[in-house]
């Protein structure tokens, strides 16, 4: 049983948008998993073998308790009934308390489809009188992380302080050499420079060194305002 399940369209999306959150939860003793929906291949400089090795290296840095790939088609991901059932079965098996999915507005069709799929599968996972294996389960909440392909100003519901975890987040992202280093321009600002600037911006917003924005479709409750940074 997992406390947190981060669902990613491709291997590297969870690292880009939620690695700081993952590392913080792990540091607090939570059981955290990642489900990649597709292999992420083909890409210009990647291969299935290379991407799998990169994912394994990033997984080790994050210290994940569980990671699997659902094996859905890259570049043509759709929230079909078959895909919904497959994801709902996983949710009934690993029984996460909270889900993390990509932000719902994106230029990448796979990302948009992934979010629609997560929301539908979350509902299906609680169904009774079904031929799906496993006992019914309904994750309490969905948070949305930003790994978008749009130049837009994010409007998060909260920003998590990831200052102690930034360097490890960057190390996990660097594992995907075929995606973020190979074939990329080396003149500043590099892609990784831009990621650092973005995290620093969100850190500044909350008075910290680095931050990770998260969105929610539903209101968030606090036990006490003392929990605010």
Language-model features: locations:
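Metal-dependent de-N-acetylase/amidase catalytic core
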Residues: 1-7, 78-229
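Active-site rim/loop-helix segments in enzyme catalytic domains that contact anionic ligands
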Residues: 1-94, 215, 227
